[in-house]
């Protein structure tokens, strides 16, 4: 069984630095997808949960206002602001939404394939959870 990160924001390991530059490890585990997503100012993404999928997201530039709560929980979702250079994690069965107040580009790595029929068979839409 995988051990999930204990917090939404994932602490990054130390980078490898020398005179050539830097290598920053992000995610080192078995997964089936990696996608690059650009979101425009005012966009809202997600408002769903995944039954089996999980994903890590790394913000290249911009900022994500990330809302999350366990599936079925009717309390207000928790809000986390994810900034440029930060990595965050969403496990299965967590309702989540992403709000973009500025143009943002981020990379997502997931457990499952992002082929549309595979993705849609595991994603469950929920009413908007962002305020």
PLM-predicted stretches and their roles:
Residues 1-33:
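A short, N-terminal "cap"/entry segment at the start of jelly-roll beta-barrel domains
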Residues 35-53:
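Conserved short histidine dyad/triad with adjacent acidic residue
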Residues 52-71:
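Glycine- and acidic-residue-biased ligand/ion/polar-headgroup-sensing regions
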Residues 70-92:
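Short acidic-glycine-tyrosine-enriched beta hairpin
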Residues 23, 47, 66-67, 90, ...:
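Short beta-strand His + acidic residue motifs that chelate non-heme Fe in jelly-roll/DSBH
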Residues 5, 11, 72-74, 97-131:
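Double-stranded beta-helix
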Residues 48, 54-59, 80, 88, ...:
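His/acidic/aromatic-lined binding-pocket segments of jelly-roll/cupin-type domains
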Residues 35, 44-45, 62-68, 87:
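Short beta-strand segments in beta-sandwich/barrel cores
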């Amino acid at each position: 069984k995988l051990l999930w990160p204990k917090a939404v924001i994932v602490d990054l390991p130390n980078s490898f630095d020398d005179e050539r530059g830097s290598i920053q490890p992000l995610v080192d585990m078995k997964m089936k997808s990696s996608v690059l997503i650009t979101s425009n100012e005012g966009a809202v993404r997600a408002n769903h949960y995944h039954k089996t999928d999980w994903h890590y997201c790394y913000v290249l530039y911009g900022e994500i206002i990330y809302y999350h709560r366990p599936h079925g929980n009717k309390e207000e979702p928790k809000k986390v602001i994810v900034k440029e250079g930060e990595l965050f994690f969403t496990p299965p069965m967590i309702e989540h939404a992403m709000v973009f107040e500025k143009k943002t580009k981020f990379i997502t790595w997931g457990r499952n394939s992002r082929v549309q029929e595979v993705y849609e068979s595991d994603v469950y839409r929920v009413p908007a959870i962002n305020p």
